[in-house]
């Protein structure tokens, strides 16, 4: 097999990973890295892996990993597994219960509130002519939406935000012990606060998602206290992190494709446009699985063996730029007919539960920004997050008028 390297820590890869994906897909689509994990870059291989129950999401339980300080810390300090890392049937039960709060009709009811939050977030930019996209729009809107959904008190919003950001950093597979320790401290502060909120809500049920999660029942089963707590923490983290990066990536895509920006100005932002923005530069680039059995993937006339318990990095970003599925994949094209085949929200049983919410928030935030300002220019080049899994800008200064 031809020599090709995958170094996700290279600053150039952080800025633009897609040329590396192209080379891997062409020369070594089932790539074994020096670190011992396998990288998949073909669309069909990624989809098949995510939909195959012989591949587990529970890495700590099923992967053959060397004992490291990081792994030891995770094992000794995790009180319960997030739904993100559970396999069926445990995942199936939890998902069935919590999905009742994420129906399309329930999400669509949020449109007026999201619009209000976006309008409020852009008010200052109308006066100053400048907008720091992440701090002033991409972060506060989805974070407040999640707080509203759970009917959280607003008195400790800044603390919740700080805790959430610290905990989010621990989700990266490359996280070190120092960040994990910070995450445990943040969870230690967050849990008592959320426990008090949940106790209060049990006595004062309302028309909010937290009340719904407390009361939801199916076939005699309900969420226990630990499951409820784990899911509320997950909501706070995943509920805003994806959208923050999606909004930032979307504006970067539009400002580097002025022809498509002009199309959006003319028609408004549509759900299909959001799908194309997700395909073009999605906020989640990779997801990890481990096979429960020895398996193989066919490349040309050869079966590439993947051993039970090995780590498999299914590259969502690479799949979204596979030319065998998406013609001219490196072009942002709002006339593309199959944009909705993107893998930005993964596939299979772990398809993102909050996908419809993230899409609605992005549709309104990006669409309103483009409609509100006739001129949007880059004041300084974006700073990209130093993450393996998450792709997004940490800072993006714009001039608007």
Where are the regions a protein language model picked out?
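Cytochrome P450
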Residues: 1-401
């Amino acid at each position: 097999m031809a020599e090709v390297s995958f170094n996700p820590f290279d600053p150039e890869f952080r800025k633009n990973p897609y040329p590396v994906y192209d080379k891997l897909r062409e020369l070594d689509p089932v790539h074994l890295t020096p670190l011992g994990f396998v990288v998949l870059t073909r669309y069909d291989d990624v989809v098949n892996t995510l939909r195959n129950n012989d591949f587990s999401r529970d890495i700590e339980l099923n992967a053959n990993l060397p004992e490291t300080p990081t792994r030891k810390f995770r094992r000794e300090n995790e009180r319960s597994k997030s739904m993100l890392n559970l396999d069926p049937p445990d995942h199936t039960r939890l998902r069935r219960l919590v999905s009742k709060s994420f129906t399309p009709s329930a999400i669509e009811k949020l449109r007026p509130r999201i619009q209000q939050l976006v309008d409020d977030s852009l008010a200052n930019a109308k006066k100053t002519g400048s907008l720091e996209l992440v701090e002033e729009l991409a972060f506060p809107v989805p974070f407040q939406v999640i707080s509203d959904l759970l009917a959280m008190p607003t008195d400790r919003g800044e603390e919740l935000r700080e805790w959430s950001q610290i905990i989010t950093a621990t989700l990266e597979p490359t996280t070190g012990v120092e960040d994990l320790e910070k995450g445990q401290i943040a969870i230690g502060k967050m849990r008592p606060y959320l426990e008090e909120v949940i106790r209060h809500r049990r006595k004062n049920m309302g028309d909010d998602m937290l009340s719904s999660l407390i009361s939801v029942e199916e076939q005699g089963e309900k969420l226990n206290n630990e499951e409820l707590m784990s899911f509320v923490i997950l909501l706070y983290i995943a509920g805003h992190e994806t959208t923050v990066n999606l909004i930032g990536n979307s504006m970067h895509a539009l400002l580097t494709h002025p022809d498509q920006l002009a199309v959006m100005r003319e028609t408004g932002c549509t759900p299909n446009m959001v799908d194309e923005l997700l395909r073009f530069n999605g906020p989640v680039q990779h997801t990890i699985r481990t096979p429960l059995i020895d398996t193989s993937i066919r490349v040309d006339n050869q079966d590439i063996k993947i051993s039970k318990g090995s780590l498999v990095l299914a590259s969502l970003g690479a799949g979204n730029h596979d030319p065998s599925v998406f013609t001219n994949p490196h072009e942002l094209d709002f006339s593309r007919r199959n944009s909705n085949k993107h893998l930005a929200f993964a596939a299979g049983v772990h398809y993102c539960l909050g996908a419809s919410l993230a899409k609605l928030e992005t549709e309104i935030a990006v669409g309103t920004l483009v409609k509100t300002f006739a001129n949007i220019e880059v004041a300084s080049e974006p700073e990209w997050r130093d993450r393996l899994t998450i792709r997004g800008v940490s800072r993006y200064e714009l001039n608007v008028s």
